[in-house]
């Protein structure tokens, strides 16, 4: 067995994918020191190391040349991912991928320097992923793959995984200021110092903005980041500290009929007191080692977060006098450890790589509350809980190179969950333990004529909110079944991923990937955060096709074109229909980056977000949206850098998000469906829309020291 083949084994098992640099943020070991690797400069050959077609790495250069309207849009560098918002800028974004409306993160696992960012049993929704504390200028790379195809994939990874890594070194300190429409003002300062043969990077960010909304957003955001890194490719240690805080006023979605009849402007609000405040403080530690033919990785993290979120989606449907605003609140302490070890061996003269690992996570959530409010003042508590949730994951994986053109990967993951809920109603308190096993299999064939083929079959899962696991009584006074018994739901839900794909390198500098996939879920269990109950939904299936192209035309031009089509349906038959509301169907993304010379560079992006069913019978569908963003940068001299971003260049009047449900605004009180005291008062079913911002200009001035 030659060294190149063993290198392929190590790369694929260590998470190094297409077009990824060997030194990915200094946090992850790629190959063993005794093994050579096919590479050009710092880039691994695109055909080496992948275990599925739908994986890759986003580099710092790709992020720098992409116009961004919000931090979480760095995930849109992943083919097929759409990032939207239906509320204020301090709230977690809404994500779409592979036939999923992922809500605020369910079924897409995201991490930052080893810290999991999906929150279990969250006040607003299971898997809540707030990325507003990201500083895009500090991102070194993003590793991603679709489907729960790796043994490293645990909870929330059924649709995919994104691992974000920050810089471990800084070329030059800088300070920059960004000005934009709607009183946008952002300051960012980044510096570094050498300490004991290592490097400490520090950054501070402050941002304020009112947005285009009639009711100004009054966003105030502060971010402090510190990271120390010491070591090299053989062994390295890093630890970091980050503190983030934000407060904002939100404009939630509004009924479309009130916009169409002229009673509301697209940017109006029906409850100006919506909004919130959020805090997050994180400590983390990473240690990586390799020696001869083995490697090990250890990480630990501690996170303290707080959230108070005020929302009103139905306005005056439930309470014609005080309105329907509610508060979701929590204070959380998150602790965790992760260890992974790999070693190479031979089995009947075949090169083999084995990996074992384990992770432990503990969430201690206090004051997990759902409260009825008016103008952010509580007047009733629907429920309040203290939750302690513990998760243990263990896994093992074996990879064998049977032939130069044939590799197999077999893995098994086990997860154990313990839920402990102390509710304000004893009927809804309780403890529950559950476990699940997730086998995974991949077969990699080729390359033949610069084309490599992949077969993946993997079991995954997602957990349900702990409150849904122990709830036995409906405590929502707004519901007609108030104080009626409820069935508790299964803690863990099985998913199955299947994928066939290829990765081609048919001409120089062009990488093309094609994936045909299917994902089955036993149940779309959903905890309704604004009701305090869990709604078990129906089993589902999703399938689709993804095509991605990345072309490095030369040293100064990069082009990418990605298209995805998905079909999402409930498996069982029902009179209401089998469409999954909000499920993404079609997306298209295209971009170009052009570096004219050492001074000028340009970037452009087009994003198409196709129409989708908003209710089960597909009789109501959302509109599509197409947005074009542009970026131009100019290096005036060695110290001064300028950049202009023009967002939504065509000034398209499109919506960021659309829903369909019943509500009552005061403007509707003259109708029977919304008249206070009316026996027919059930609300007006309509699309509810949250618009994208119009044309938006931003200017950045950076001084490099």
Model-identified regions with their sequence ranges:
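Transmembrane beta-barrel wall of Gram-negative outer-membrane proteins
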Residues: 174-208, 213-251, 274-293, 343, ...
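Membrane-embedded beta-barrel scaffold of Gram-negative outer-membrane proteins
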Residues: 288-290, 295-313, 446, 452-460, ...
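Short acidic/polar hinge/loop motifs at secondary-structure boundaries
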Residues: 116-146, 164-165
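Face-selective signature of the C-terminal outer-membrane beta-barrel domain
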Residues: 236-244, 276-424, 444, 506, ...
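C-terminal beta-signal and adjacent terminal beta-strands/loops
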Residues: 63, 611-612, 634-705
